[in-house]
């Protein structure tokens, strides 16, 4: 009996779907069947396993779930029930708030945990504001809309929530919050204390597909001599029912005209579909199709996710069994074999995955002072205004992902003092370090430098690109730092070949480059350079012509929003490509609140940490007294722990160490991240540098102090 006479296995299709619909689906021509779907049939599309970013308008948008908690609610208003309403705003206008959702009513108390979670779409390149409004509720099913019933409000930026690295943010409650204070990053000091809120965000469970590949061997043919059929297979998930089992269709392979040793392409299955239970049975049908499109059945086999996870080998070589042939022939063994040749659990990490796991963004700025023609005062003022707007637009977003808000700034294309030699790479602040404190520090350095330098007629951008590339390689542990360099130019660039080489080198660095052309100059050569295919490993550069984004008839915030969206749109994609090329996986999210009450017991190993902010400004002038441990012991001033100030970016910028009454005072800014990234050994080394390693509390030998002239040395550290 030939295979053409063999009937398909007994129909065990899901009872919730139409059998006729599935019959029509399987009897359709192959090319049409793969392009259409049936209601109730979940088909996992066969796509490339190489991680890639979508090309939508907002390619790196992610959904987060926001939850709100009130602590120490101190309002004088009376209420029996209270609700929380969330509004979002992407503008600077107070009348543009749109409602996100409303929580269910909660009984009024000093500490309220709203169990409802608000789903929100996060976009990196946008300034997104969230306003939480807490109001009394008179009707259980309808919150009050009157302004008199509003008890407190709080406004925060979504960037601050994501950039807090613990996905948790603390804010003070206000009676009437405004957008200006939220955008400035400072909270107003009010006479009336209303309490605070804790804003937490969670990322929904992400899709983690599995990649599978099968090869066949000696599969039965329709005709032994004149066989022109193509062989393929279908994957089903087997679900057990009360009456009978059902099959859920998952995937269908391509058809190959090779029965002896077909090698199908790898395909992807969603873990939720194929492995909701590790021992969930997967039934695979091996079939053939002739030139007329008619299909026939060869056999089937069963497997599970847990078994395939062992990988290629003898455990994953399956016999294809045809139940009809097996019942008719006693000598029947199988209708061929199927072998698993690839099985991979794939995790596609997104930009948000890396940010919440601790990756910091750093912003570097390069300003080109050159001009091919003499600049009039009016043109210079326009250039300064556009430069200020562009730096503010881009920097106001990136700064929320920068813990210390320090930005490196460079000058290009000018004669610099004191010798007034030509330079295309100098620090904008004319210091030994290019770091400026905040965006205000960058603009102040630019204004001072503008009065001190003489512009050139042409410039070179490659020196600054190479400098920042080297700086990004030295920024710390791989995967924890990513840099964004913005180059502002209005003149003629003469080193296009060197720029191309610098961009190729930067493709291996954690760096994205934004070249922003300003004014009416012809930037066609730079546009062509940035748009053509690079020899590097990934795309790192984007060109933006600022004039095409500005509209004088619109409000300034609209121009700023347009600049930020255009300039930063591809930065998440660049960062994800770098992480994937470097095989850097995102770590689990850091579950730490970046608040002034940040707890870091790891600063001194094996010592409990106590926080007393009232003692921060009460440092003794002579020495450090420890009455609780050694009542009669006064340590000399040379043993007092003094933070080092000679290293920029070290933890001494955030720490104020004071050993008094057995306590350690720690000052950490809200978005500080360096503490959690430093290993135990590094902190011990840093404590030695600051002099703390010479003391070990609470054991201090008085005889040691007397014999050593006031110095204590413990060999155990």
UniProtKB/Swiss-Prot annotation:
Record domain VWFA: where: 377-567
Endpoints of the signal sequence: none
Entry superkingdom: Eukaryota
Pfam families cross-referenced by the UniProt entry: Copine
GO-annotated biological processes: cellular response to calcium ion
Start and end residues of each C2 domain: 193-318
GO cellular component: plasma membrane
Record GO terms (molecular function): calcium-dependent phospholipid binding
Family to which the UniProt record says this protein belongs: Belongs to the copine family.
Name of the protein this chain belongs to: Copine family protein 5
Classification of source organism: Eukaryota, Metazoa, Ecdysozoa, Nematoda, Chromadorea
């Amino acid at each position: 009996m030939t295979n053409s006479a063999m009937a398909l296995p007994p129909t065990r299709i899901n009872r919730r779907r139409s059998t006729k619909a599935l019959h029509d689906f399987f009897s359709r021509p192959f090319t049409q069947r793969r392009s259409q779907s049936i209601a109730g049939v979940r088909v996992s599309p066969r796509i490339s396993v190489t991680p890639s970013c979508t090309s939508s308008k907002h390619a790196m948008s992610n959904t987060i779930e926001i939850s709100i908690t009130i602590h120490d609610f101190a309002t004088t208003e009376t209420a029996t029930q209270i609700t929380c309403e969330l509004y979002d705003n992407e503008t600077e206008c107070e009348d543009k708030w749109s409602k996100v959702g409303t929580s269910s009513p909660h009984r009024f108390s000093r500490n309220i945990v709203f169990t409802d979670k608000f789903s929100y779409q996060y976009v990196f390149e946008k300034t997104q504001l969230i306003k939480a409004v807490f109001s009394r509720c008179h009707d259980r099913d309808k919150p009050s809309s009157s302004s008199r019933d509003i008890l407190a409000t709080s406004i925060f930026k979504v960037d601050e929530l994501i950039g807090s690295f613990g996905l948790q943010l603390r804010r003070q409650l206000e009676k009437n919050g405004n957008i200006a204070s939220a955008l400035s990053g400072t909270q107003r000091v009010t006479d009336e204390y209303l309490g605070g809120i804790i804003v937490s965000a969670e990322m929904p469970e992400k899709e983690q597909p599995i990649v599978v590949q099968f090869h066949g061997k000696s599969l039965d043919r329709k005709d032994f001599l004149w066989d022109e059929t193509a062989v393929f297979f279908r994957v089903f998930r087997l679900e057990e029912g009360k009456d009978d089992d059902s099959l859920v269709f998952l995937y269908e392979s391509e058809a190959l005209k090779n029965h002896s040793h077909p090698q199908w392409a790898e395909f992807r299955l969603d873990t939720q579909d194929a492995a909701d239970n590790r021992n969930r049975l997967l039934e695979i049908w091996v079939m053939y199709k002739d030139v007329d499109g008619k299909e026939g059945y060869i056999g089937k086999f069963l497997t599970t996710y847990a078994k395939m996870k062992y990988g290629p080998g003898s455990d994953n070589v399956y016999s294809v069994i045809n139940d009809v042939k097996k019942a008719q022939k006693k000598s029947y063994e199988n209708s061929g074999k199927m072998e698993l040749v690839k099985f991979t659990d794939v995790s596609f990490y997104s930009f948000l995955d890396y940010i919440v796991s601790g990756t910091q963004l750093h912003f570097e700025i390069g300003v080109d002072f050159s001009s091919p023609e003499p600049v009039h005062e009016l043109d210079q003022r326009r250039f300064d205004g556009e430069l200020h707007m562009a730096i503010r637009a881009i920097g106001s977003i990136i700064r929320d992902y920068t813990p210390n808000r320090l930005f490196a700034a460079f000058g290009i294309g000018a004669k610099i003092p004191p010798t007034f030699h030509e330079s295309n790479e100098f620090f904008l602040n004319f210091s030994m370090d290019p770091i400026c404190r905040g965006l205000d520090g960058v603009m102040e350095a630019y204004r001072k430098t503008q009065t001190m330098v003489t512009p050139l007629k042409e410039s070179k951008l490659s020196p600054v690109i190479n400098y920042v590339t080297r700086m990004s390689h030295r920024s710390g542990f791989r995967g924890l730092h990513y840099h964004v360099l913005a180059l502002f130019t209005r003149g003629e660039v003469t080193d296009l070949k060197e720029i191309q080489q610098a961009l190729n080198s930067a493709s291996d660095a954690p760096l994205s480059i934004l070249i922003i052309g300003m004014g009416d100059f012809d930037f066609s050569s730079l546009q062509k350079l940035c748009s053509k295919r690079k020899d590097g490993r990934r795309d790192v550069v984007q060109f933006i012509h600022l004039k095409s984004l500005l509209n004088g008839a619109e409000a300034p915030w609209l121009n700023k929003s347009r600049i930020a969206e255009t300039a930063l749109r591809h930065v998440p994609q660049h960062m994800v490509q770098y992480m994937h090329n470097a095989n850097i996986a995102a770590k689990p999210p850091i579950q730490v609140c970046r608040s002034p009450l940040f707890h870091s017991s790891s600063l001194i190993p094996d010592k409990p940490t106590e926080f007393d902010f009232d003692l921060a400004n009460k440092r003794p002038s002579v020495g450090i007294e420890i009455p609780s441990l050694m009542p009669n012991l006064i340590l000399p001033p040379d043993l007092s722990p003094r933070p080092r100030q000679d290293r920029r970016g070290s933890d001494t910028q955030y720490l104020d160490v004071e050993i008094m009454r057995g306590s350690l005072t720690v000052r950490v800014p809200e978005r500080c991240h360096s503490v959690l990234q430093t290993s135990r050994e590094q902190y011990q080394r840093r404590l030695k540098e600051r002099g703390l390693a010479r003391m070990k509390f609470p054991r201090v030998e008085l005889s040691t102090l007397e014999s050593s002239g006031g110095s204590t040395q413990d060999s155990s550290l």
